[in-house]
Amino acid sequence: TNIYFNEIQIFIEAKNKNDLELQKKLVISLEGKYECLNSKQRANIHLSAVWINNFVNHMISKGKKICLENNISFSLMEPILKKTINQAINYNPDELQTGPAVRNDKDTLGLHLNLIKDVNDKKLYEIITKSIQKNYE
């Protein structure tokens, strides 16, 4: 995978101005964008990135697996995937949450749990469902 520095944000921190200026020049020479953050902010932005990127990608992978195992083209999910990401960028995700967990739709939740055969996936579904429900109490 190629890294295009003009497409990512680089977070920099230094103990003195000279080092900070050197870091800025390096990022600019790579045609990158930088933001100065302290150590706590950098740790928290990394945590946020894991939720937004790694965990979301994992969920997409699980959804794709369900499609493939059931002879459903994953391309059918592309519109909802694009819509979800675009709305999350442009609006408050807390105001956009939909689905059986928010509605407390026990019939659909039960159906989904019956469809999930893997014990760990079932636990993950239950944990995420509870997290969504708790967020909207």
Predicted features by range, described:
Residues 93-137:
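C-terminal active-site/capping subdomain that shapes the small-molecule cofactor and substrate pocket
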